[in-house]
Amino acid sequence: MIKVGILGPVGSGKTSLIEFLAKEYSERGIKVGILTNDVVSAYDAMRIYHNLVERLRILPRENVLGLVTGGCPHTAIREDPSLNLRALETLEERANPDLVFIESGGDNVMSTFSSSLADFTIFVLDTSAGDKYPGKGGIGITESDLLVVNKIDLAPYVQADLNKMREDSLRVRRGKPSVFISLKTGEGTRELIRILDEELGLERVFGNKGQ
C-alpha cells in the first residue's frame, strides 16, 4: 500500500486534487483509498463520498474514511499521527487499497507529514494567493516530494507572474519536481500524472495498471 500525503493551505485545491487523482488511478484498475483530516467536521470526506461514491460511482463506500482531529491540523499528521495510523489500519482491513491519498487539514507552509504516515508528500499552493509564496519557502514548500501550484488559470486575474513562481520553485526546491496545473481547465494535469507515475514507481509496482 503506497501512502501519498497531500497538504497545503485552506482553499488551495487539495480535495479537488484528490478527486482528480482518485478518478485517474481508479480508471486504471488501481484500488484507491482516501483518508481525510478535518479539524471540526468531516466536510471533505462527505464531499468526496458524494462525488466519487454516490455520483460517479468510482469508489466503493468502504474506500473513503474521514477523521475529525480537532486542534492544530499538523499535530495529527506529524507530532502524533496515531489517530491516522489507526485509521489507515481500518482502511486497509476493510478495503485493502493499493494507493491511499491522505489529506491534511488546511495548514500553512510549515506543514509536513510524519514519515511513518506518508511515503510521498505533495504540497498544494493556490496561484491566487500570490506569486510570492514559492519564494517565501517553508518546509512544506521546500521539503515536499512534489510541489503542485494549482489554479494557474487565475494568474491573469490576480496579476501573478507564473514565470517568477516557476523560477522561485526551482530555486528553493533545489531540483525537486514542481508542476503548475489548473484542475478547472486540465492544463498541466498530464504532466502531473507523468511525474507521479515516475516518482511513485507505479509501473514497477502495479505492472500494466501503473501505465
UniProtKB/Swiss-Prot annotation:
Any one GO molecular-function label of the UniProt entry: nickel cation binding
Example of a GO biological process term: urea catabolic process
Top-level division of the source organism's lineage: Archaea
Main location group: cytoplasm
Positions bound to GTP: G8, P9, V10, G11, S12, G13, K14, T15
Alphabetized InterPro entries for the sequence: CobW/HypB/UreG_nucleotide-bd, P-loop_NTPase, UreG
Compartments, record wording: Cytoplasm
Protein family (similarity comment): Belongs to the SIMIBI class G3E GTPase family. UreG subfamily.
Name of this chain's protein: Urease accessory protein UreG
One of the record's GO cellular component terms: cytoplasm
Role summary: Facilitates the functional incorporation of the urease nickel metallocenter. This process requires GTP hydrolysis, probably effectuated by UreG.
Quaternary context: Homodimer. UreD, UreF and UreG form a complex that acts as a GTP-hydrolysis-dependent molecular chaperone, activating the urease apoprotein by helping to assemble the nickel containing metallocenter of UreC. The UreE protein probably delivers the nickel.
Presence of the UniProt keyword Acetylation in the record: no
Keywords: Chaperone, Cytoplasm, GTP-binding, Nickel insertion, Nucleotide-binding
Any Pfam family hit: cobW
